[in-house]
Regions:
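A generic structural signal for short beta-strands and their flanking turns/coil linkers
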Residues: 2-4, 19, 34, 49-51
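A short, exposed loop/beta-hairpin motif centered on an aromatic-Gly-Thr core
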Residues: 15-26
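A short, charged, amphipathic alpha-helix used as a generic interaction element across diverse proteins
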Residues: 25-45
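Short, mixed-charge low-complexity intrinsically disordered segments
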Residues: 42-76
Length: 76
């Protein structure tokens, strides 16, 4: 199990995740980041389009970034 950190960044702002979540695989972290991006797009709509959920490991290395996109709104 590994701890992953989910930072929300965009438009010159950052909401840093200082706690993280312990997940079994990078794929599960990716899935969690996708859900976060979807949630941001649906709940905050235009305010967060263009933002991203950056996922990093405990050493601070960014593993991947999931953009908050309008296309998520079409799926809602």
């Amino acid at each position: 199990m590994t701890r992953y950190f989910f930072d929300v960044v965009g438009h010159g702002r950052s909401e840093l995740d200082y706690t993280g979540r312990i997940l079994p695989t990078p794929e599960r972290a990716y899935d969690a980041a996708e859900l976060m991006a979807f949630d941001l797009a649906v709940k905050q709509e235009d305010a967060t389009i263009g933002w991203a959920v950056n996922v990093s490991n405990v050493e601070g290395h960014k593993l991947f970034s999931i953009p908050v996109q309008e296309s998520y709104l079409a799926a809602a």
